[in-house]
């Protein structure tokens, strides 16, 4: 594949004066190329490999400065009448990516819609292995002037339908204002996955022409907030051109700008350009740039409701920009749908990015999240997969069968329930009557709309769809490395999961109206009971952790257990008890009226304080184990028979409880990690997770419940129409066909110039945006709901703590109400741990029998 090189040459028409050809064609990669037009492809491949390597060499060497670039452009980019940069400023509008030099052209509307086929830059065209089809030589722009649900009925269409192609995989990448590093990380990962599909020559579905069965849809949530360097990356790939989009067409405001192009260029996160010589195959890309910010759920509405009915895919892959899929992970996800026709949704493992040589593990917050992610993928997801219902398929990397998501003829189904969240949040920010009709319970519930989608999919009427976890597929993503962003992220997760969990339990009777058989329904009911217990534990988690702290640390107050002597065990307990209460008080104060970004140091101090308390709890636990063994050694007559000694140990309540406690938590963590052949996190991340555990439980839960009134979902009520891109009006009608006059690039030189500028921009370091988020005014109803919920939550946990801790208690080795409650909690936790462990084992066994 050719390369694009920047050299000064009087014959050039842009900033990159000419393309120099080198003899660096990589014939070893020829088997990765599509088989379309083999003879022409081989000729193009041999000729054009040189152009791409030229671009790479020029990009890494002899890079002129910005001033030199523009001076060169001023002398090199000329038409017959005037210099490009010498044109008047009025005709070189630089605002928001409008082309600097334009001419007015007359075009016919397509089905009363503005659709423009724009030639791609000469530099890019010369670098392509395949350039004999308009999908390679022209960028198609469509100005969507309707809502997503009306897209097909308003006469809009897409290239895959025009080419009569059947789409097996429809991949969506949603983004907001992520930078070019995050974007290229995901985009290049997707490109490599599609190349992997094309390398499967023995597959009946894939092979060299497999790229024709895959469509990648990129949805940007708001034209004004999208990162400009991401647009430069897309322009370099040929997927985007500035200056052709318009704000209004025939007096109708444009809702979304849709660009379609089949690219043969990929750019990695180091801004290196990759082509067919690096194994890149053609990829059909659809870039949907929404005019206004309407949040991720609206982006999915465009994907599912606007493009889905036209594309008619078999499997939809959902990705967040910033998540890098493994090189064959998309194929691994697709394979479970192909193997089992009852699979309606699937997800892979979400891994935390740990940096070069896992250096990010030096950050305790990242290490704790790494441990949390790993154990969730080892214990929780496999367990739920065995039952057939995964409570949440993470939107960062998951897949759905499109037929399973579709609504019925009456418009009822999973997608209907899923998109209620968008309308619901719009109502909450509207009139007071809308607030009365809706409620914040539903609003918080739809903060985790992906959980609602999973439940409605499994419970779909008269259907029997299942959800599955695919351990061989993974996606890597950045996790918050700073405490404020971590708290903000978990606030939405915790509130959404809690209220969505309540929703699932309330509506679990829908399972009986689905098409599942008796055995599967019974399994789902068992999982429902497990979810009820987990939800109750979540509600009382703050109180239960304090009770555990209270009894473990107070046990060292007893004179026969005190390791310090002279009553120091009791003094330290009193200090820790008051310190614990003070930290809780500080968290409540900070959570009720402050953003984590504004109270960063207070939250950090509380996290450190709880970590210190946890260190003391670990010391107390270790000492109690030592004393328990010592007391048992003095109390019983031990033998040389292991079985007899085990029976003696289990007959002692204190020693038995300690053994069960260790085995049902740390033992299960270690054994299950080894069985899944992933023990590394136990060595690197277990201790940070253990130390931050009280912070997880107290800080995150308190902040989440104290902010249930915050259900803001971005820019609502903004009905203004921008005019910066221009307005297209109907000038006349000819034989019933509307004709418009529109400003477009003056000639090919202008297109080439803009492409050169985008390539140069890839080497520029982006400026960091450190702007602070604005505050939103909340209605009294929001805060009233929050107040009542928090009061109920505090009352439940406080009553539990008061009832248990006011009993007579000396140490964990003496019977009391406290030790009885601790024993009950211990056995319940042990049962839940064993239940998760058995589910994980069953998942591994099922994987052995279903592999292949």
From Swiss-Prot:
Q: Which UniProt keywords apply?
A: Cell membrane, Cell wall biogenesis/degradation, Glycosyltransferase, Membrane, Transferase, Transmembrane, Transmembrane helix
Q: Where in the cell is it found?
A: Cell membrane
Annotated region Disordered: the residues are 27-46, 53-97
Reaction equation(s) it catalyzes = [(1->4)-N-acetyl-beta-D-glucosaminyl](n) + UDP-N-acetyl-alpha-D-glucosamine = [(1->4)-N-acetyl-beta-D-glucosaminyl](n+1) + UDP + H(+)
The membrane-topology field of this record reads: Multi-pass membrane protein
- Reported EC number(s) for this entry are 2.4.1.16
The UniProt entry's GO CC annotations, sorted and at most eight, read: cell septum; plasma membrane
| Principal EC category | transferase
Q: Name one GO biological process term.
A: chitin biosynthetic process
List the biased-composition ranges (Polar residues): 53-74
Family of this protein: Belongs to the chitin synthase family. Class II subfamily.
Q: Which PANTHER family match?
A: CHITIN SYNTHASE, CHITIN SYNTHASE 1
> What protein name applies here?
Chitin synthase 1
Organism per entry = Mucor circinelloides f. lusitanicus (Mucor racemosus var. lusitanicus)
Which gene underlies this protein? Answer: CHS1
């Amino acid at each position: 594949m050719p390369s694009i090189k920047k050299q000064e040459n009087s014959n050039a028409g842009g900033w990159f004066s000419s393309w120099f050809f080198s003899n660096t064609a990589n014939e070893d990669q020829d088997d990765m190329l599509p088989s379309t037009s083999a003879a022409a492809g081989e000729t193009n491949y041999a000729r054009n490999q040189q152009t791409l390597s030229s671009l790479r060499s020029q990009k890494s060497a002899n890079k002129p400065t910005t001033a030199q670039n523009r001076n060169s452009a001023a002398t090199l980019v000329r038409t017959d009448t005037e210099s490009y940069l010498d044109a008047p400023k009025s005709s070189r509008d630089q605002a928001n990516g409008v082309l600097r030099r334009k001419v007015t052209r007359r075009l016919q509307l397509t089905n009363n819609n503005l659709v423009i086929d724009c030639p791609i830059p000469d530099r890019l065209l010369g670098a392509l292995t395949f350039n004999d089809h308009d999908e390679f030589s022209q960028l198609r722009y469509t100005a969507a002037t309707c809502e997503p649900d009306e897209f097909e009925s308003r006469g809009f269409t897409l290239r895959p339908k025009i080419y009569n192609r059947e789409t097996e995989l429809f991949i969506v990448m949603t983004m907001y204002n992520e930078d070019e590093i995050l974007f290229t990380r995901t985009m290049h990962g997707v490109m490599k996955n599609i190349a992997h599909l094309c390398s499967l020559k023995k597959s009946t579905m894939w092979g060299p022409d497999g790229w024709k069965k895959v469509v990648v849809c990129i949805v940007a949530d708001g034209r004004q907030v999208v990162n400009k360097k991401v647009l430069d990356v897309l322009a370099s790939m040929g997927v985007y051109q500035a200056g052709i989009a318009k704000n209004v067409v025939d007096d109708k405001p444009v809702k979304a700008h849709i660009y379609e192009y089949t690219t043969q260029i990929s750019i990695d996160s180091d801004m290196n350009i990759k082509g067919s010589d690096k194994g890149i195959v053609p990829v059909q890309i659809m870039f949907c740039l929404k005019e206004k910010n309407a949040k991720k759920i609206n982006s999915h509405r465009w994907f599912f409701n606007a493009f889905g009915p036209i594309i008619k895919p078999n499997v939809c892959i959902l990705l967040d920009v910033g998540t890098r899929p493994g090189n064959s992970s998309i194929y691994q996800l697709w394979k479970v749908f192909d193997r089992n026709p009852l699979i309606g949704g699937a997800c892979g493992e979400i891994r935390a990015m740990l940096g070069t040589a896992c250096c990010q593990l030096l950050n305790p917050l990242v290490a704790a999240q790494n441990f949390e992610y790993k154990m969730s993928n080892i214990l929780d997801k496999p367990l739920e997969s065995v039952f057939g219902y995964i409570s949440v398929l993470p939107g960062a990397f998951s897949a759905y069968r499109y037929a399973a998501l579709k609504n019925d003829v009456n418009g009822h189904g999973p997608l209907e329930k899923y998109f209620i969240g968008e309308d619901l949040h719009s109502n909450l920010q509207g009139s007071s009557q809308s607030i009365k009709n809706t409620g914040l319970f539903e609003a918080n519930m739809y903060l985790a709309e992906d959980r609602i989608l999973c439940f409605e999919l499994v419970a779909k009427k008269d259907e029997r769809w299942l959800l599955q976890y695919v351990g061989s597929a993974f996606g890597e993503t950045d996790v918050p490395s700073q405490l404020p962003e971590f708290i903000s992220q978990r606030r939405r997760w915790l509130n959404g999961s809690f209220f969505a969990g309540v929703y699932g339990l309330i509506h679990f009777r829908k399972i009986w109206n689905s098409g599942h058989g008796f055995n599967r329904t019974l399994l789902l009911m068992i999982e429902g009971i497990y979810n009820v217990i987990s939800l109750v534990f979540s509600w009382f988690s703050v109180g239960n952790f304090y009770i555990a702290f209270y009894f473990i640390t107070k046990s060292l107050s007893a004179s026969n257990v005190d390791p310090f002597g002279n009553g120091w065990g009791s003094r330290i307990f009193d200090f820790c008890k008051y310190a614990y209460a003070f930290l809780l008080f500080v968290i409540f104060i900070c959570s009720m009226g402050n953003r984590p970004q504004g109270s960063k140091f207070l939250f950090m101090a509380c996290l450190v304080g709880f970590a210190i308390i946890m260190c003391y709890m670990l010391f107390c636990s270790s000492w109690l184990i030592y004393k328990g063994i010592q007391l048992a050694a003095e109390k019983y007559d031990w033998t040389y028979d292991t079985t007899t000694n085990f029976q003696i140990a289990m007959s002692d309540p204190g020693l038995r409880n300690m053994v069960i406690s260790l085995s049902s938590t740390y033992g299960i963590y270690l054994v299950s990690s080894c069985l899944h052949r992933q023990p590394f996190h136990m060595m690197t991340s277990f201790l940070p997770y253990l130390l931050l555990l009280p912070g997880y439980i107290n800080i995150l839960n308190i902040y989440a419940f104290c902010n249930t009134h915050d259900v803001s979902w971005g820019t609502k009520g903004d009905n203004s129409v921008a005019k910066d891109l221009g307005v297209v009006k109907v000038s006349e009608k000819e034989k019933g066909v509307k004709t418009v006059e529109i400003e477009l690039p003056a000639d090919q030189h202008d297109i080439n110039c803009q492409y050169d500028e985008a390539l140069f921009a890839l080497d520029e370091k982006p400026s960091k945006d450190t702007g602070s988020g604005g505050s939103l005014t909340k209605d009294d109803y929001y805060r009233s709901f929050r107040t009542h919920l928090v009061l109920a939550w505090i009352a439940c946990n406080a009553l539990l703590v008061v009832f248990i801790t006011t009993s007579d208690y000396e140490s964990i080795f003496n019977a009391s109400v406290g030790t009885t409650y601790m024993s009950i909690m211990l056995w319940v936790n042990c049962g839940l741990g064993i239940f998760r462990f058995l589910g994980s084992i069953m998942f591994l066994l099922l994987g052995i029998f279903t592999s292949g």
